[in-house]
């Protein structure tokens, strides 16, 4: 007679074992109709699963995050159902959920086209609209293998052979004549799976190993209702318009080429944005009492072995040899900063020492993962390392957190997800050290009243970390900032200070990055602003243009005034209509266009327009200069006339 405890604390007693769905039915028909699955004692279970003992139960519906993930997983099975009907010889591999959707890897003797995707999507819709029940069946390992051997599914048999114990009882899910194997849970009926779209096909090796056969990966998205689906597709369209690679080319910011994969060729305008970011961060370094240093970008293998990077990070390091010595190009700045700390005797009175660097780092990322500025091999980190005592950890981490929010707020990012990443399986240092490090970060987060998510096993090999992920205007998350405690590296590199009792102690090291990779951050803000950089960041802040040749001299005079005031300005004296010039510079996202005609010359003024098409009227040149300088000094996000 199980007693079921519901989320509100109420209890229901049943005479016999009861299914998740039956409990929902006992509460109400509306809830039963909405039930996708249940969370029994915290574990997700199918709606048909029986509850034999006293348990807690939460009903999962399409309104829950778990419910949406289950819908997506079931849509992957629906795709399998459809492709098996249209291409009976296809061999099914794996079909998991991913962010915003799902995919299925299939082995088919022909390449799928967009037309095939359209046909598949249509068949999926036809099947889903029949609202058939999904039937779950627990079988023995041998029964499952016999089932897939009979159905000619070698990949399913391989999963059973390699991943599932022979004494296990895997679950088979029956979609009419189609059978798939999965941990589940899945929807009880296909009425929940009406809102999806197949997105693209890509290649994927079986098991992710290039030695194995290349399969075709069909990507799809799925949502709880039509409004959510349409909203997502609209966001994708907007994201395509904001793609930093497209905007970067249109604005002549940078380029990349095959001879230097994952490396950026910065053009003048892109490098201007880069340097403005550096300048801004430098002002904050001064405000938060950091010293700026510069270390070598290549060091001997011996040092990297001491730090543990060679053993734990070697696959991602570029190496070279000279005079019978092996060197590694640095993938991160921390070992170099310890070398600087080690020069000269340090006292506890000297701590904390906050050491920052715009460090040029290189990582040998897989070529398939490279993506514009977002994933590169050569990048610049706004990196810092704080050497402190254990007693100073919380105050220093708190200062880092304050700096993170200060800088992100300047760019308009206020929705920030905070995550605490704990010890990974592959790590250095004793468990006691990890206990102290993880607790220190957790205490600082609690002290700052920050809600955070724990990411088990996602820390670096030398310490746990706090991650800050920015949520942009398209509701995407970008992980940028990190604060990382490290009790191991200073000791490995013999860093020490003289404590108050005159004993030598090893300092705690806090790794801190805010923008992360500056290249990646430029990619993020390019998409966030759609290339409409605020005036302080814009490569060109104003263009001064004439109407006829008679105003050319006045234009040059105005340009000199703005340039002498420290503003980035260009003249456009081409023999083109002023409307043509305005349109061209609008497409280049120049914040302000200053038009000089005979009337403006007579009054000593300029006519001001913004890139958004707002006519701001005429301004005295000096007045406009002061207004623009104020926008730049204040790092304001909006232009004149934008509220």
From Swiss-Prot:
The keyword tRNA-binding applies. Keywords: Aminoacyl-tRNA synthetase, ATP-binding, Cytoplasm, Ligase, Metal-binding, Nucleotide-binding, Protein biosynthesis, RNA-binding, tRNA-binding, Zinc. GO terms for cellular component: cytosol. GO terms for molecular function: ATP binding; metal ion binding; threonine-tRNA ligase activity; tRNA binding. SMART domains: tRNA_SAD. Coiled coil: none annotated. Binds 1 zinc ion per subunit. Belongs to the class-II aminoacyl-tRNA synthetase family. This is Threonine--tRNA ligase. The gene is thrS.
């Amino acid at each position: 007679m199980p007693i079921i405890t519901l989320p509100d604390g109420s209890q229901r007693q049943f005479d016999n074992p009861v299914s998740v769905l039956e409990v929902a039915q006992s509460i109400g028909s509306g809830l039963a109709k909405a039930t996708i699955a249940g969370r029994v004692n915290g574990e997700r279970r199918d709606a048909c699963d029986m509850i034999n003992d006293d348990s807690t139960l939460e009903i999962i519906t399409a309104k829950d995050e778990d419910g949406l993930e289950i819908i997506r997983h079931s849509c992957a099975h629906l795709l399998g159902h459809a492709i098996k009907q249209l291409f009976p010889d296809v061999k099914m591999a794996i079909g998991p959920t991913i962010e915003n959707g799902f995919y299925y890897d299939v082995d088919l003797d022909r390449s799928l086209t967009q037309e095939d995707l359209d046909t598949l999507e249509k068949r999926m819709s036809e099947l889903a609209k029949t609202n058939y029940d999904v039937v779950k069946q627990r079988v023995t390992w041998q029964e499952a293998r016999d089932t897939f051997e009979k159905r000619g599914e070698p990949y399913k048999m391989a999963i059973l052979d390699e991943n599932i114990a022979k004494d296990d009882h895997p679950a088979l899910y029956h979609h009419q004549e189609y059978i798939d194997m999965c941990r589940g849970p899945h929807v009880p009926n296909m009425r929940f799976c009406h809102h999806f779209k197949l997105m693209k096909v890509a290649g994927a090796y079986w098991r992710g190993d290039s030695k194995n056969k290349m399969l075709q990966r069909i990507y799809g998205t799925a949502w709880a209702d039509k409004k959510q689906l349409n909203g997502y597709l609209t966001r994708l369209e907007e994201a395509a318009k904001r793609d930093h690679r497209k905007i970067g080319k249109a604005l002549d910011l940078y380029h990349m080429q095959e001879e230097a994969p994952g490396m950026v060729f910065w053009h003048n305008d892109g490098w201007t944005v880069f340097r403005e970011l550096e300048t801004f961060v430098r002002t904050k370094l001064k405000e938060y009492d950091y010293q700026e240093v510069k270390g070598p970008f290549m060091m001997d293998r011996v040092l990297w072995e001491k730090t543990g990077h060679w053993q734990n990070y070697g696959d991602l390091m570029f190496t070279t040899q000279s005079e019978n010595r092996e060197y590694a190009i640095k993938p991160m700045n921390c070992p170099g900063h310890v070398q600087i700390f080690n020069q000269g005797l340090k006292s506890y009175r000297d701590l904390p020492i906050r050491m920052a660097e715009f460090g040029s780092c290189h990582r040998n990322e897989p070529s398939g993962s490279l993506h514009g500025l977002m994933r590169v091999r050569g990048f610049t980190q706004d990196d810092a390392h704080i050497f402190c005592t254990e007693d100073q950890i919380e105050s220093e981490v708190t200062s880092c957190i304050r700096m993170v929010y200060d800088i992100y707020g300047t760019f308009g990012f206020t929705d920030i997800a905070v995550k605490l990443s704990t010890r990974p399986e592959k790590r250095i240092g004793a468990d006691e050290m990890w206990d102290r490090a993880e607790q220190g970060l957790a205490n600082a987060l609690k002290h700052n009243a920050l809600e955070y998510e724990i990411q088990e096993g996602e820390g670096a090999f030398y310490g746990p970390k706090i991650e800050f992920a920015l949520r942009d205007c398209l509701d995407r998350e970008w992980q940028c900032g990190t604060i990382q405690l490290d009790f191991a590296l200073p000791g490995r590199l013999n860093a020490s200070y003289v404590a108050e009792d005159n004993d030598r102690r090893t300092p705690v090291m806090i790794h801190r990055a805010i923008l992360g990779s500056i290249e990646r951050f430029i990619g993020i803000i390019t998409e966030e602003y759609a290339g409409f950089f605020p005036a302080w960041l814009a490569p060109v802040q104003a263009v001064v243009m004439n109407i006829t040749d008679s105003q050319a001299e006045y234009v040059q005079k105005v340009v000199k005034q703005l340039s002498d005031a420290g503003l980035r300005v260009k003249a456009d004296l081409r023999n083109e209509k002023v409307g043509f010039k305005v349109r061209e510079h609008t497409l280049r996202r120049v914040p302000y266009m200053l038009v000089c005609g005979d009337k403006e010359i007579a009054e000593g003024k300029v006519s001001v327009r913004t890139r958004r098409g707002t006519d701001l009227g005429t301004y005295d040149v000096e007045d406009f200069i002061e207004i623009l300088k104020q926008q730049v000094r204040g790092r304001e996000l909006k232009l004149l006339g934008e509220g």
